[in-house]
C-alpha cells in the first residue's frame, strides 16, 4: 500500500524524470520512463553508475545503451521473454486444441457405439440373436475401443511433446532480448542498435564522427580457408575493436565483413587518428585456423572516416563514410581515408 511519503516521493521523481529524458533526447516510452524513474530514484547504484558513464561519454543516452540497461537492471525474465513465448505457445495451444477436439469427437462417437452395442446385446434374449450376431457386436466394440485408445495416446504424446517444446523455448527465449541488440557471431552491437544510436546522436545536434571499416579480401579468405575460418576472423577483429574502444567510442557489426565505430564528441582529425591506430592493430592480428592448425596473418581492413556536418541525415553520413571506405579499397586497401 502506498503511503503519503511514497506518493510525495513518486511525484517528486516524476517532476525530475520527464525534463531529464527530454534533455538527453530519450523517447517517452513506458520502458524508458521505467529506466529513468529508477535512475532518478537511485534505487540501483550500479545502474546509476553505468548511466552516468554513458551520459559522460555520449552527452545523451543512445537507444541501445538505454535498452541494454533496462534489460540488465529492470526487466524481469518473464517480461523479457513474454512476447515471443506467447506467440510460440499460441501455436502449440492451437495444435493441442485441435488434437483435443479430435479426441473428444472420437470419444463422443465411441459413446454412441457403446450405447448401440448395449442395446444390441439387450436383444440377445428378446430376439434370440445368434452367436455370430453377438460376436459382430463385440468385434465392433473391440475395434472402436482400439481407435479411441489410439486417439487418446496420440493426444498424450502431443501433450508430452508440447511440454518438452515449451521447456526448450524457455531456455532459448532468455537470449531473445539480447539478440535484438547484439550480433550473435561477433558479440558487438548489431545494425539495429547502430541505426538507433547514430540517428539519435545526429538529431541531438551533437558533434559525432563515424568510422566505417571493411575487412580486405574477405571473400578470398573464405574461399581459401572456408567460412568457419571467416567467422574466426570476424570474431578476432570484433574482440580487437572492443579492446581498443574507449571514451565513448562504440563498435558495431554493420553487416557481413563491415563494422562501424561511433565516436561521439570527436572531430574528424581525432577520429581519423583513432582509425589509424585500429588499422595498425588489425594488421598485426594472427588468426589460427582451428581445422588445419595453420596461423594466418596479413589480415587488413580499409577505413572511411567522416564527421557529421550540418544537414546530415543517417543515410548521408553513412553514404559519405562508405564512399571514403571504397576509395581506400581502390587505392590499394589497408588504409584510412581521407588522407
Swiss-Prot record:
Molecular function, one GO term: GTP binding
GO biological process: cell adhesion involved in single-species biofilm formation; negative regulation of bacterial-type flagellum-dependent cell motility
Cofactor info, note text: Binds 1 Mg(2+) ion per subunit.
Keyword DNA-binding: no
Enzyme type, top EC level: transferase
Residues given in the record as substrate binding sites: 222, 231
Family matches, as InterPro entries: Diguanylate_Cyclase, GGDEF_dom, Nucleotide_cyclase, Rev_trsase/Diguanyl_cyclase
Residue ranges annotated for the GGDEF domain, each copy included: 206-339
EC number, as in UniProt: 2.7.7.65
Binding site for Mg(2+): 214, 257
SMART domains found in the cross-reference section: GGDEF
Keyword Magnesium: yes
Recorded metabolic or biological pathway in which this protein acts: Purine metabolism; 3',5'-cyclic di-GMP biosynthesis
Site note Transition state stabilizer, residues: 219
Identification of the protein by name: Diguanylate cyclase VdcA
Organism: Vibrio cholerae serotype O1 (strain ATCC 39315 / El Tor Inaba N16961)
Amino acid at each position: 500500500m502506498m503511503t503519503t511519503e511514497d506518493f510525495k516521493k513518486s511525484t517528486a521523481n516524476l517532476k525530475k524524470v520527464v525534463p531529464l529524458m527530454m534533455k538527453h533526447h530519450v523517447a517517452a516510452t513506458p520502458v524508458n520512463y521505467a529506466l529513468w524513474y529508477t535512475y532518478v530514484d537511485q534505487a540501483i547504484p550500479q545502474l546509476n553508475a553505468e548511466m552516468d558513464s554513458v551520459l559522460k561519454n555520449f552527452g545523451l543516452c543512445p537507444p541501445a545503451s538505454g535498452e541494454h540497461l533496462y534489460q540488465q537492471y529492470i526487466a524481469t525474465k518473464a517480461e523479457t521473454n513474454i512476447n515471443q513465448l506467447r506467440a510460440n505457445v499460441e501455436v502449440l495451444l492451437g495444435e493441442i486444441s485441435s488434437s483435443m477436439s479430435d479426441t473428444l469427437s472420437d470419444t463422443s462417437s465411441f459413446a454412441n457405439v457403446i450405447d448401440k452395442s448395449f442395446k444390441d446385446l439387450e436383444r440377445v434374449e428378446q430376439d434370440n440373436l445368434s452367436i455370430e450376431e453377438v460376436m459382430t457386436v463385440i468385434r465392433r466394440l473391440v475395434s472402436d475401443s482400439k481407435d479411441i485408445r489410439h486417439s487418446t495416446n496420440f493426444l498424450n504424446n502431443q501433450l508430452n511433446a508440447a511440454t518438452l517444446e515449451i521447456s526448450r523455448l524457455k531456455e532459448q527465449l532468455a537470449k531473445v532480448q539480447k539478440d535484438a541488440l547484439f550480433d550473435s557471431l561477433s558479440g558487438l552491437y548489431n545494425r539495429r542498435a547502430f541505426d538507433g544510436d547514430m540517428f539519435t546522436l545526429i538529431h541531438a545536434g551533437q558533434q559525432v564522427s563515424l568510422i566505417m571499416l571493411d575487412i580486405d579480401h574477405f571473400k578470398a579468405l573464405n574461399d581459401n580457408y572456408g567460412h568457419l575460418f571467416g567467422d574466426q576472423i570476424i570474431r578476432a577483429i570484433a574482440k580487437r575493436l572492443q579492446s581498443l574502444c574507449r571514451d565513448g567510442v562504440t563498435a558495431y557489426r554493420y553487416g557481413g565483413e563491415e563494422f562501424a565505430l561511433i565516436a561521439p564528441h570527436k572531430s574528424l582529425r581525432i577520429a581519423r587518428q583513432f582509425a589509424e591506430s585500429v588499422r595498425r592493430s588489425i594488421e598485426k592480428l594472427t588468426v589460427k585456423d582451428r581445422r588445419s592448425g595453420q596461423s594466418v596473418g596479413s589480415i587488413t581492413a580499409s577505413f572511411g572516416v567522416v564527421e557529421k556536418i550540418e544537414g546530415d541525415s543517417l543515410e548521408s553520413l553513412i553514404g559519405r563514410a562508405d564512399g571514403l571506405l571504397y576509395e581506400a579499397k581502390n587505392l590499394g586497401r589497408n588504409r584510412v581515408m581521407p588522407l
